[in-house]
Structures are given as C-alpha cells and as structure tokens.
C-alpha cells in the first residue's frame, strides 16, 4: 500500500501544467494535483495569457502548491521550456491542462520509483477518455525500454514521464524546431542517446482527454511522424520507415482494442 511506504529521502516533485484558454478542464487538473497523497509537490501553471477565465480559476484555487506564471508564449514547447527553467523540484514532469491523474496515489508511485538512486526517469501507462471522462477509448500500455525501441515506433506516454532535474540540465530542453514531436524527440534523446535509466511503472497514472494537437487531424498525425523520422535521423538512430509505421499501426490498433474491452468491464 502506498500509504505504508516510508520514504528514505523526501523528494520534491515539480508538476508543470501548460495552459491556454483551458477554462472547461483546468479545474480537474488542479484538483488532481491537490488531492495527491504525496505532498512534497510544486505545481507550476505556465499560462499563455488566457482570455477565457482560466486565470481566475487558477488564482482562486485553494492549493498553496500552485505557482502561476501567465504571459504570451511562442507555442506549447516554449511554454514547457519555461516550466523546466522555473522548476525547483528534484523530479520534474508534466500534466496537461485537460488531463488528470488516475487516482490520489500517482505522485507517491512516482516518488517511490525514484527512491532507487539508479533511476533517472520513470514512465507508466495512460488511458484516453472521452471529454466527459465517462469511458475509456484507448489504453496506452507501455513496457520496459529497450535500446532501439524508438526506431520501431515505440514511445512512452509523455504525460507519465518524470525525470530528474539533473538529467534535464545535462541533456537539454525541448527542441522547438519540432512543432508536434518535441516531446518524442526529448524522450528519444534521453533514453536512446543519454543512457538515462528509466523505470517502468505498470499502472495507469494519467487519464487524457481526446483532442490533443497531434490527434486533431490526419494531417497532424502525418506531420508528427515526419518529425519523428527527422528526430531519428538527427539523433543517428537507424530505422526503416515501413517497419516503423507497421509497428505503430499494430500498436495503436491493439491500444484501441484494449480500450474497448476496458470500456465494457
């Protein structure tokens, strides 16, 4: 049981939420962090100068862990990089402004993974849900990382990816030349090239609403894959486009099939 864990070292976790006009969903995100059993947490909300009431919700929230920064940005990865620069926790991760944690033990599970000093990063499973959170649509089941996995179309779910700040300082921030795949490129750079030792937590940690930028259209999906191919080449990772796409399609079909099964149980 998480409640029975005694941490040898209390580790501060910085959770970064990037927002822009998120009035319909950000309350769930703020509440998800505030309800966590693990409390050594900093919640950074990096807002892009929202105009719809988002700022009022954040400012009125009772959680003292929240730090709000609101100013125009150059896009989501610019905002994420601002969060990385401001984070004071030893461990850093992201929770999107329309996503939320699966339960109150998520950050405790993450803190527990980092009790092992050999662990530099961790990631877990994620489910996609409908806008009203009434049903699971897709189950993103991950696995332990093996070198070469990114060339096969594999990638951890970025909202479940937490990493030591010392690793970020060593290996760098999001590359903003990528418009849809900077998160994939960062994890690729860390795991494939940076020899970051990552622990896989075999639990669903995040519930993600459908409708993210990458999944909004086939055009964006194609563009993201093109950017991933660019990232693979840039990072010197050999790959076959056909093998990459075949593996990715099979993986996605399986994820939707499992999501369908979970929906009916």
Question: PLM features: what roles do these ranges have?
Answer:
Residues 104-136:
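Conserved donor NDP-sugar-binding/catalytic core segment of glycosyltransferases
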Residues 124, 140-227:
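Conserved nucleotide-sugar donor-binding catalytic segment
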Residues 31-40:
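Short, acidic, metal-binding catalytic loop of nucleotide-sugar glycosyltransferases
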Residues 92:
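Short aromatic/hydrophobic "clamp" motif used to bind/position activated sugar donors
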Residues 12-14, 42, 185:
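Cell-envelope/extracellular polymer assembly enzymes that use nucleotide-activated donors
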Residues 21, 33, 48-49, 53, ...:
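Conserved short acidic donor-positioning loop in nucleotide-sugar-dependent glycosyltransferases
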Residues 39, 47-56, 96:
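A conserved acidic beta->alpha catalytic loop
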Residues 71-87:
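Glycine-rich, basic loop-to-helix element that forms the pyrophosphate-binding segment
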């Amino acid at each position: 049981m998480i409640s029975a864990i005694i941490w040898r070292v209390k580790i501060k976790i910085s959770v970064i939420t990037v927002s822009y006009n998120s009035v319909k969903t950000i309350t769930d995100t703020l509440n998800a962090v505030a309800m966590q059993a693990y409390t050594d947490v900093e919640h950074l909300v990096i807002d892009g100068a929202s105009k719809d009431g988002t700022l009022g919700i954040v400012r009125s929230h009772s959680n003292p862990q929240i730090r709000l920064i609101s100013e125009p940005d150059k896009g989501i990865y610019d905002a994420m990089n601002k969060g990385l620069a401001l984070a004071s926790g030893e461990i850093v991760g992201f929770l999107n402004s329309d996503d939320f944690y699966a339960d109150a033990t998520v950050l405790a599970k993450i803190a527990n993974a980092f009790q092992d000093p050999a662990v530099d990063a961790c990631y877990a499973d994620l489910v996609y849900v409908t806008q009203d959170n009434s049903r699971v649509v897709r189950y993103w089941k991950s696995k332990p990382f093996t070198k070469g996995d990114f060339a096969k179309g594999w990638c951890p779910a970025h909202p479940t990816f937490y990493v030591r700040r010392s690793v970020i300082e060593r290996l760098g921030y999001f590359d903003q030349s990528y418009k849809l795949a900077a998160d994939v490129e960062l994890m690729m750079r860390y795991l494939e090239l940076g020899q970051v030792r990552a622990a896989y937590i075999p639990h669903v940690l995040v519930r993600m609403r459908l409708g993210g930028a990458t999944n909004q259209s086939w055009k964006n999906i194609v563009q993201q894959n093109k950017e991933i191919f660019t990232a693979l080449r840039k990072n010197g990772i050999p790959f076959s486009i056909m093998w990459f796409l075949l593996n990715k399609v099979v993986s996605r079909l399986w994820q939707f099939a499992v999501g369908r099964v979970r929906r009916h149980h």
